A protein has these predicted regions:
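Conserved GNAT acetyl-CoA-binding A-motif
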Residues: 87-100
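Conserved acetyl-CoA-binding loop-helix of GNAT-fold acetyltransferases
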Residues: 66, 72-85, 108-113
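Acetyl-CoA-dependent GNAT
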Residues: 2-68, 80-81, 86, 122, ...
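Short phosphate-binding/catalytic loops that engage adenosine nucleotides
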Residues: 75, 92, 116
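A short, internal acetyl-CoA/4′-phosphopantetheine-binding micro-motif in the GNAT/acyltransferase core
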Residues: 64-71, 99-101
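Conserved acetyl-CoA-binding loop of GNAT-fold acetyltransferases
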Residues: 111-121
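Terminal substrate-recognition subdomain of acyl/acetyltransferases
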Residues: 124-151
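Conserved beta-strand-loop-alpha-helix junction that forms the acyl-donor binding cleft
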Residues: 97-107, 123-129, 137
Length: 151
């Protein structure tokens, strides 16, 4: 099991150096929550929890990242459990996320195994160039939205 904490100001530089915090500006501007997974006092994964999601209006898990060496070891499960607990603690009923319909089958299988189901909305095609950490990144993907009731 991995310890999961909310990102603290004193940890930003250390975490960002190892695990790029792609939504750090959004986190600072909107009061969203960055969750950090730790193993032996080292950051090994993160997830961004936007309290008002971009598509469904529900709290939305975004920007999940786990160090490649620790994928399929329970880090993402620990991050998901922590996000769900925060949503429950605020008295909210559901949490959502989007995942690639075609190019990220392992993540989709993970979320479905955790109880996320298709939200019943039309998949969204994302195409173009985005900037992550100052670098251009070409995107051409179709996202499906999943939802989980946490109460």
């Amino acid at each position: 099991m991995f310890a999961v904490t909310e990102l603290r100001p004193e940890d930003v530089a250390r975490v960002d150096a190892l695990l790029p915090l792609n939504r750090l500006a959004q986190h600072r501007e909107t009061g969203s929550t960055y969750l950090i997974a730790w193993k032996d006092d080292e950051p090994v994964g993160h997830a961004h929890l936007a309290w008002t999601g971009t598509h469904l209006g529900l709290p939305e898990v975004q920007d999940v990242y786990v160090l490649p060496a620790l994928r399929r070891h329970g880090v993402a499960r620990s991050l998901s459990a922590a996000a769900e607990e925060l949503v429950r603690a605020r008295g909210l009923l559901s949490i959502s996320l989007s995942v690639s319909r075609d190019s990220n089958a392992p993540a989709r299988l993970l979320y479905e195994s955790l109880g996320y189901v298709d939200a019943g909305v039309e998949p969204v095609r994302v195409r173009g160039t985005i900037t992550l950490r100052g670098q251009p990144f070409d995107v051409d993907d179709t996202l499906v939205y999943l939802v989980k009731h946490v109460r």
